[in-house]
Amino acid sequence: MFPYPQLNFPPVYPTNPMAYRDPNPPRCRWRPFRPPLAAQIEDLRRSIANLTFKQRSPNPPPGPPPKKKKSAPKPKPTQPKKKKQQAKKTKRKPKPGKRQRMCMKLESDKTFPIMLNGQVNGYACVVGGRLMKPLHVEGKIDNEQLAAVKLKKASMYDLEYGDVPQNMKSDTLQYTSDKPPGFYNWHHGAVQYENGRFTVPRGVGGKGDSGRPILDNRGRVVAIVLGGANEGTRTALSVVTWNQKGVTIKDTPEGSEPWSLVTALCVLSNVTFPCDKPPVCYSLAPERTLDVLEENVDNPNYDTLLENVLKCPSRRPKRSITDDFTLTSPYLGFCPYCRHSAPCFSPIKIENVWDESDDGSIRIQVSAQFGYNQAGTADVTKFRYMSFDHDHDIKEDSMDKIAISTSGPCRRLGHKGYFLLAQCPPGDSVTVSITSGASENSCTVEKKIRRKFVGREEYLFPPVHGKLVKCHVYDHLKETSAGYITMHRPGPHAYKSYLEEASGEVYIKPPSGKNVTYECKCGDYSTGIVSTRTKMNGCTKAKQCIAYKSDQTKWVFNSPDLIRHTDHSVQGKLHIPFRLTPTVCPVPLAHTPTVTKWFKGITLHLTATRPTLLTTRKLGLRADATAEWITGTTSRNFSVGREGLEYVWGNHEPVRVWAQESAPGDPHGWPHEIIIHYYHRHPVYTVIVLCGVALAILVGTASSAACIAKARRDCLTPYALAPNATVPTALAVLCCIRPTNAETFGETLNHLWFNNQPFLWAQLCIPLAALVILFRCFSCCMPFLLVAGVCLGKVDAFEHATTVPNVPGIPYKALVERAGYAPLNLEITVVSSELTPSTNKEYVTCRFHTVIPSPQVKCCGSLECKASSKADYTCRVFGGVYPFMWGGAQCFCDSENTQLSEAYVEFAPDCTIDHAVALKVHTAALKVGLRIVYGNTTAHLDTFVNGVTPGSSRDLKVIAGPISAAFSPFDHKVVIRKGLVYNYDFPEYGAMKPGAFGDIQASSLDATDIVARTDIRLLKPSVKNIHVPYTQAVSGYEMWKNNSGRPLQETAPFGCKIEVEPLRASNCAYGHIPISIDIPDAAFVRSSESPTILEVSCTVADCIYSADFGGSLTLQYKADREGHCPVHSHSTTAVLKEATTHVTAVGSITLHFSTSSPQANFIVSLCGKKTTCNAECKPPADHIIGEPHKVDQEFQAAVSKTSWNWLLALFGGASSLIVVGLIVLVCSSMLINTRR
């Protein structure tokens, strides 16, 4: 496939005539020099030609095209020239895009729209004699014959299909399973197919394109589009394709949405309308617009409705000066500290402060509004606030008058609506102030702003150059959404400025052009609405009346300092700007540590100009993880074993090191050198052996001395040498023993014939019975052997079974020997491994946000709580609040007033980034990536290690597992937070505990099934001002974050790398994997076609036992022909670096090997001919290296031959002393007894 230009469909109206275009445009090539005057004349001629022939006619007005005037007939002589030109054009090659246009015509003829409510909801196409329609697309096919076809549902593929009528079967599209990477044809342009996925540029295609086919250049259907998912700059398509067998396959990228054009409907007074076309707009009917938004606040398309009610239709387009915060109004709120002194009602009350960003920036919500002028239109240089003076009008001022501070001044980064974004120094409080002339309004709240840093090194300021790590910061764009804040219509609030007391009379004085509602109790209760200065009859004191105005065209924030309007519930919501978004942040890199290597250990010399974290873990079964923050210059010692050690210094990458069996002394030297060497390598065993040798020598010496002393004592005793000696008793006893000999076979049969004939015949039947049983076994097995012999000739693969260590990167080498064939070298390497457990998502938890709605206050009456589905919803009614007039609610009654206080919790706005997922972990499945080299062929494959599931690569078939040891770094319960995994025994779903992990739970972040228990307790309000006091437990999520310990990424054993999405442990080095391989016959070479080695001998030139290939050997050989031979080490003591080599008739080859033993005696084969190599290896010079050992150390090779000789000599000497003593003792005893 190849790219092609996007198609242009014929316009509704004729386009302007194209300008003249030279078919052979001038190019930058060498031309002969022309005089300047000739060049100027030529340029002038070209300019006149451009003005004459390249003029475009003006755009035609909308409507039917104007009639063309009849042009005069052109002279006849010009016609032949036109024909000539036309003939020349026909001789040219077809212009590019012709096949694409043909495909598009096929697509338009064989694709039929699906209509729903008069709109195209999707498409159906006829492919291979069948009608195919996406299952999620509702409506009727716009074709009478196809609309009558009965369709069958295939929900697995999101399709409906049926046979097309007989008269249409010959006129359908054909499908194909051939999809080479490249570009394909679609209705909206080119579709790229790469890595098994169809993608288009983002913004191409969308709702209503479901069911459109993707065609190749021959007009065959490659796929049918069902939907798509945005992935950055491109959109991945969800499609239905076919495989080589014609079976349907559905390929759905993660996060894809179906592309059916379903019109989103909203409701207004039981009448539905499209959400993108509301019947009202805010500029024309503000109160009605708020009614529409409140009625559809829970509609999934609320954001679409909110966006469109701000756009009023007009005859000409103009820049919009309204946005979502135009619907709102600033307000006065109760601030605990005004100007760092007493509490007050402040025009810039701080409602919330968020400090979840990793770069130290904070997001503040206040009662003023930023980016708007006094009228409420957008103006980035202004802000507006509610004045506390007189009539509480809304005023505006310059954004330069806004100041934010903590322990020092803050830098403002952005603003929108009620929200500010600022960069602040650390502090214990946050202050926002308005400086206007000599007056200043400020509000201070207690909030600890900590110094933030990312990574493993603390820093005050991010570096200019460093390492980039993942972090989360507040997005400076105002259009991003971090969630919603709830809004409501403001309730009535009385102002004293609306009352005037003069000469014992009371007047209602509304602002100019405003209506004011009054309530008076001057004997009788009276109420009304006035717009001009009005006298209240019978009233003598201003405190007998209250006057207020209620604006139902604006929303205010759902603040606990405001009374909720009695006619409206809390239903509005607006977006919170400055979303917390993932990005990368620069972090510093500490000085690289200096490493000193010693025997089985390292010393890290560290220099840190700032607090830097050092973590370590062992790569064996016991991780023994450590963590330490280091400042200044220091050194740390760590022991390193054969299993390895991993350390991470600051923001540097992890470093893994392994110990070599290096030690002073010489395992092949003198006894003192041998003792020094083995004492450093194996101190305990060396001490035990030395103690045993010393004890043997001591026992031998003592025994020999005792025997000699006893013999001397016996010989020198006078009475023991008496005359008339007799024969010793021991010799006399030997004379009493009768000589015996066994009877022959003939004598035995003769004895049985004359004495016991039945037993004779029984003895003769035993061999006969054995022969009968053997022949019967052969007769039973003969059919199986015959079948096996027949099938043996038909087998096309040779099965080889072996066991491979599950250590990524360490190859396992074997030699496959098959009768009649030359040996085949086999190398198996575990390239990667993934231990993926099956998980069950229990719930999602994060920091909760407590919502305190504006209270409901009823003067001279009572209220009742109602049930609610909100999480941890608490409601209480308090009586006797805000007594007669001087209370915050300004009620006329004394003790009959009531307040309904509510509280509930929800997920914090930044939970989309900072949250934890609680998972239950079950059985894990191990999947390994293998690299198998047999002969000259290399194969890569992935297979599950379960002993059942086969893996294949071309002609190679592999069955792996089950693994020798069951292991998983995950406990039964794990918690995932920001990509880090913790083993944590979290509470079950629904078993919430206040102040503990899981105090707020939900199935997902956007779910509505939130449950919580945070111990909210509502308190009775004081009488001074409207408020909702409460107490609550601390966030359990924040407590867990501060005490969660270290993640599994730093503490997992066996060097596992823990990853998420999905949860898995990668490259864990543990256990052994049994593997059965079916090697194809083509890989083997018959013995008659390969060289035969006649003689071979091995000489070891040099040997250093280490993790590297420190040994070198030479094979002297004689062969019958020239060719290639496999070489292999048949012992686990050593492994060869080379797998094959070239041999001649007579010659030698040099090979390299790796061993971990001082005495490496191993068998090497060349083309199947074996020989033994004896290597006395020296210890390596490097104590610590950066790669693991390739072979393990064995006991028989751990002790050198020289050491065995010295050890046996010592034991032999000790035993010789004992033997000498015993000989002396026996000789003396015999002498004494003889003389007696």
Swiss-Prot record:
Residues 260-271 are annotated as: Functions as an uncleaved signal peptide for the precursor of protein E3/E2. It catalyses: Autocatalytic release of the core protein from the N-terminus of the togavirus structural polyprotein by hydrolysis of a -Trp-|-Ser- bond. This is Structural polyprotein. The modification Phosphothreonine is found at residue 111. Residues 96-110 are annotated as: Ribosome-binding. Keywords: Capsid protein, Cleavage on pair of basic residues, Disulfide bond, Eukaryotic host gene expression shutoff by virus, Eukaryotic host transcription shutoff by virus, Fusion of virus membrane with host endosomal membrane, Fusion of virus membrane with host membrane, Glycoprotein, Host cell membrane, Host cytoplasm, Host endoplasmic reticulum, Host gene expression shutoff by virus, Host Golgi apparatus, Host membrane, Host nucleus, Host-virus interaction, Hydrolase, Ion channel, Ion transport, Lipoprotein, Membrane, Palmitate, Phosphoprotein, Protease, RNA-binding, Serine protease, T=4 icosahedral capsid protein, Transmembrane, Transmembrane helix, Transport, Viral attachment to host cell, Viral attachment to host entry receptor, Viral ion channel, Viral penetration into host cytoplasm, Virion, Virus entry into host cell. A motif (Nuclear localization signal) lies at residues 67-70. Residues 37-70 are annotated as: Host transcription inhibition.
